[in-house]
Amino acid sequence: MGRVPPMSEAYEEFGLLADNAREVGLAWNGRPAVVRREARMRDGRTLSAVVWGSGPPSAVLIHGRSQNAHTWDTVALALLADDANRAFVAVDLPGHGHSQWKDDHDYRAEANAPDVLVAADALAPQARLLVGMSLGGLTSLALLGDAPKRFDRLILVDITPGVNPGKGRAIAEFTSGPERFASFDEILERTLRYNPGRSEASLRRGVLHNAREFPDGSWSWRWDPGRPAVAPGSLAPLWDVLGELTLPLTLVRGSASPVVDDDDVAELVRRRPDAEVVVVEGAGHSIQGDRPLELAELLSARWPTPSARERP
């Protein structure tokens, strides 16, 4: 694999987007409008986000546990290829990506929700669509439990409140590994081992976005490793939130993912008979990485139409 040069020489945050486009066959006409911004939390911390497009953002995308805003990069490029006038925000959850860590290391959905709401109001005040993947989906439910009228549509990506440690065992095994790696090769090798269906090129990009290099050449993940375990049954209140929501709800499920099972889908439909359930064939838990074009197409079909709420 070969050791990469120091990040100061090799890594420019948005310099890898052309590679994203090439890998999935998207035309590359130069870097789109994209910038990193921050929102200040009430306690002085900052929540970081990637803002795509040049108009008022109409959607907020939230990644999963141990990921970051760049997990959406290929999806974002496909969304803009479909409609260059779109604008949206992909946030880094607290303790992830470029967002600051919390002193209490509490990154449960209900703890994340107030921060994400502050960031959404600051960076995407007119956004109407909320898209949450895994922990981001649970955070979305917690947010809507606090502010049920803030968004007009919710799309959950391979997650329900029925998730439990058994369903997420492979994810937990990966994220509970070493906190420091001797080299880039070492951290990349572990990532490849746990993601056998993904290309080395895509995982290399993912590691560059999601890890940092130290002066001695060692690497560590950007996420805060000091996270408490989620107690069994602690997500049950989010089922109640889901059932009480009146906005349109879509669950996008990966056909090869163990995280959402048939019982979860049945419970979701029992509580929300009008909910839409879509299965993406060949996708695992991280549908945005496994089948980004298919996910982008699904999002495009459910994208908010322009309205007075979106005008400057």
Predicted regions and their residues:
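Alpha/beta-hydrolase fold catalytic core
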Residues: M1-A59, D83-R86, A124-P125, W303-P312
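Active-site loop/oxyanion-hole signature of alpha/beta-hydrolase fold enzymes
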Residues: R42-R45, A87-V131, E297
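Conserved HGGG/HGGXW glycine-rich cap/lid loop of the alpha/beta-hydrolase fold
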Residues: V50-H98
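Conserved hydrolase catalytic core segment
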Residues: Q126-P165
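A catalytic-pocket lid/entrance helix-loop region that shapes and gates access to the active site
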Residues: V157-D185
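Conserved alpha/beta-hydrolase catalytic His-Asp/Glu region
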Residues: A182-A236
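Conserved serine/cysteine hydrolase catalytic core
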Residues: F214-R271, E276-V279
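Catalytic histidine-centered segment of alpha/beta-hydrolase-like enzymes
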Residues: A283-P292, A296
